[in-house]
Amino acid sequence: VMADDMCDGIGGSTASHNTAMAKLREKRAHWAPVDKRQLCLGLANYGFYYKGLKPGEKADGPLSRYGSYITYREFLPRVETGGWTEEYDPEAEVSYYFSPDREEFVTIENPVSMRRKIEWITANGFRGAFWWEFHHDYVAPTAEQPAVRHHLNDVVTAHLKEPAADAPNTAKDE
């Protein structure tokens, strides 16, 4: 079950979150007939870039006229050196990122939202997770960092390697 594209993306008419956690919780009822231990949830290493629209705004034509797909690797420099700012949407449980002039925005996962999703997946007994596209957050090895890294995928790997906690898990829906 893909956690991404639960919005209009660039194929619809309203600019909204790509991977809203709230949408996963909402859509869960549709999967009820299938044993959740047989379901893997898809996580996205890409998002959507929009220009000339505000989040939730309906476009006067196809969203593809206002935006495009953007990989995490393409997105990251905007935040690191481009002055883009994050605004968390507590209702959707994910963030938007805005350009300095607020004429552009991106909806994309970040390490915090990715961590919340994998915690929810494991707490609720799903089979696991998979990515679309795995390489979109790839960090090539360097002399200083000789191992391949992934900005988002490594968050999931780290969580899965942690010993099970005895404390109650607040990520669980049931």
Please state what every model-predicted region is.
Residues 7, 107-109, 137-140:
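Acidic-and-aromatic substrate-binding clefts and catalytic sites of carbohydrate-active enzymes
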Residues 135-174:
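Aromatic-rich peripheral "rim/lid" segments of glycoside hydrolase catalytic domains that contact
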Residues 1-78:
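Substrate-binding surface in catalytic domains of secreted glycosidases
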Residues 65-126:
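Hydrophobic, secondary-structure "cap" segments at the distal end of domains
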Residues 41, 121, 129:
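Conserved, mostly hydrophobic/aromatic
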